[in-house]
């Protein structure tokens, strides 16, 4: 429980814009969909849009903004994606150059912003089904791993899929597949269930992003495609400039989680 | 029942290529997904891809081919979209100029082909649920209508949604919503249920494309977004050149219908 749990999305965004909220956004404005960010120049926008279309589990699109337009007219028409994430990452030629809390100074008229669905939506649905979500129970960021699963290439964009992991009690795995499959626009059903080595994860206790989740007796690690994938792709593709959110520091949209369910 | 019902997709495509099959493809290679076609020049490809992303009910993408590549490497890697539809339409500046059975002579290195999901997939699922599909029962093309529902604009592309109509017995409407919602990549659940006038259809017995379906006592007209929408959009947007399939004359992919179900 946190004091911001029951705030409206617009209230949270205002606090973020004023830099009164600067940390991870899990649990804020509960019930509203949060989003990952990827910004590229217009000349790469077709390739990246095609990359998302070909890799819908990792990069499910909630909103694609008009070139040069920082306002997400579909998902939060009064917001501004240059100021409404708590933390951003600036990548130049695939290298993380800096983390900032406002990208107004970096924004250019030929940039295109992509908002990508976030697993926080289905975590709420898991908990409503009495399926435990360890990193929320323990109050830390979700563990994320680079895998040996290659994303489908599109134009210049290619790279490995990043996944998030949740330990699920064995008897609840089927239900966790059902619950998350309802939400394809926030990564959908799991990518992998069980042995981490099969998808190239050497040590499940050493995530590449986020923090370790303890796997208890009788639990199985279950892996979902993750919206941090574009950052791994940027590191491989090395565009002149790309701007993303910092993992866990998301954008809160005006769309309710339940509106994203396919049935 | 038709003699081609049990053929493999590759066999049907070969007969189409040899011009031994030249008519509508409904019921051919049953159980395999069929696709609508839209081809635009590379300079418009980002706008059209964004249009599809913003209008997923009307334009659910099964495959987007590389610029200049006529081979659908994801959905039918041994096919050629220039020869494997029975009939194509060539639009210049939004005007239908001609219908041809092969577009090899029109193909250019900077063209991008989009394969869009087709309702034939969910019709099979409806029938497996004992929900009647009138135009299949009566052996004619599905009735399609231009509506007053505006698609969401993307770049230069805008225009009205085209829908297909199936008369459904009132007590089976809920089930028809459930069954078709499983298949968002072939238009998903209905766009409208009931009074045709509410979506701008003046006379349900006079479709804009295809042929009339009789609505029996106790049945309600149910409308689904239709992959002919890009043709209405081309008429509004008037690009120099666009190539589509002729309504009902689809491409047969190697993907099974059931592989497109989200759950």
Curated annotation (Swiss-Prot), chains A, B:
Cysteine pairs bridged by disulfides in the record: none
GO terms assigned for molecular function: lyase activity
Family per similarity comment: Belongs to the D-glutamate cyclase family.
Official protein name in the record: Putative hydro-lyase BPUM_0381
Biological source species: Bacillus pumilus (strain SAFR-032)
Keyword Secreted appears in the UniProt entry: no
Matching Pfam families: D-Glu_cyclase
EC number per UniProt: 4.2.1.-
HAMAP family: Hydro_lyase
């Amino acid at each position: 429980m946190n004091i911001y749990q029951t705030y409206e999305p617009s209230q949270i965004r205002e606090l973020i814009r004023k830099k009164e909220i600067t940390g991870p956004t899990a649990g804020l404005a509960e019930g509203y969909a949060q989003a990952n960010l990827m910004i590229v120049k217009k000349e790469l926008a077709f390739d990246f849009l095609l990359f998302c279309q070909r890799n819908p589990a990792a990069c499910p699109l909630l909103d694609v903004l008009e070139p040069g337009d920082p306002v997400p007219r579909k998902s939060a028409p009064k917001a501004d994606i240059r100021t409404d994430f708590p933390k951003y990452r600036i990548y130049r030629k695939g290298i993380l150059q800096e983390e900032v809390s406002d990208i107004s100074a970096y924004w250019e008229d030929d940039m295109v912003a992509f908002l990508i669905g976030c697993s926080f939506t289905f975590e709420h649905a898991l908990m409503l089904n009495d399926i435990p979500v360890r990193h929320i129970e323990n109050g830390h960021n979700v563990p994320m791993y680079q895998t040996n699963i290659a994303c489908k290439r599109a134009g210049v964009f290619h790279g490995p899929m990043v996944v998030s992991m949740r330990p699920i009690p064995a008897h609840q795995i089927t239900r966790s597949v059902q619950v998350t499959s309802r939400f394809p626009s926030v990564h959908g059903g799991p990518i992998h269930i069980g042995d981490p080595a099969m998808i190239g994860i050497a040590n499940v206790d050493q995530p590449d992003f986020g923090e370790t989740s303890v796997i208890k007796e009788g639990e199985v690690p279950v892996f979902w495609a993750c919206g941090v994938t574009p950052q791994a792709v940027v590191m491989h593709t090395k565009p002149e400039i790309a701007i993303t959110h910092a993992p866990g520091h998301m954008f809160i949209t005006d769309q309710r989680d339940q509106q994203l369910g396919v049935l």
